[in-house]
């Protein structure tokens, strides 16, 4: 990824960055429109997710997370920008004529070949079950449920590590630091997700944030008491409570919010590091 730094011609471009190499030219049969009605609101028009709204129109690129085209080699034709994610995507031309998008693995170049199957080479971009991978393999796009497609480790620069196998389960260390069990029959893609420098990208101005469909975040302490438990007071007042809370009165900043009766509770060997 080649990051271009804007010249400081105006305050809005100061320290702003943009990717100057990867462009977007999607195929018409692999894209479709999205209907965004009432950003962050439910069917009654009530805000259920704050700080969402506006944003540029997007076309959704249909990504092949399942990688279920077995033992048919494909060639990387393009590496493209996707407005729906931080990671890049690449267009694959398979030997039987079909074309699909996949997540771009780090280091993959135009002209490289990839394949998915049960016993394929341990090569960057290839997809295969965990049972056929050696220990220490760096992987991404990991399935949780067999045949459902990759759901874990799909963000830009993300990578997980296969650290153990025992019985029917494999032990993975995820980017968050969590160590959990996954069925060895589930598939994953070898390598790391591309666009590692996405976390170093600077938007430069508030308008760039609005283009992404994200609205401003306002602190509760500067609101009125009717709007937030931290609100009110004369001047710059403290929150007036023993512990900080959410806008709805629940404990915030450190309290665990994960449900205790989830089925995956027994599959997590070590919680994610904060």
Curated annotation (Swiss-Prot):
How does the record describe its quaternary structure? Answer: Part of the 50S ribosomal subunit.
Bridged cysteine pairs (disulfide): none
Its family remark reads: Belongs to the universal ribosomal protein uL2 family.
Gene3D superfamilies (alphabetical): 2.30.30.30, Nucleic acid-binding proteins (2.40.50.140), Ribosomal protein L2, domain 3 (4.10.950.10)
Task: Write down the InterPro entries for this protein, in alphabetical order.
Answer: NA-bd_OB-fold, Rib_uL2_dom2, Ribosomal_uL2, Ribosomal_uL2_bac/org-type, Ribosomal_uL2_C, Ribosomal_uL2_CS, Ribosomal_uL2_dom3, Ribosomal_uL2_RNA-bd_dom
Q: Which organism is it from?
A: Jasminum nudiflorum (Winter jasmine)
Can you say where in the cell this protein is located? Plastid, Chloroplast
- GO CC, any one term: mitochondrial large ribosomal subunit
Q: Which UniProt keywords apply?
A: Chloroplast, Plastid, Ribonucleoprotein, Ribosomal protein
Q: Which gene encodes it?
A: rpl2-A
Ranked from the top, the taxonomy reads: Eukaryota, Viridiplantae, Streptophyta, Embryophyta, Tracheophyta
The protein here is known as Large ribosomal subunit protein uL2cz/uL2cy
SUPFAM superfamilies with a match to the protein in the record: Nucleic acid-binding proteins, Translation proteins SH3-like domain
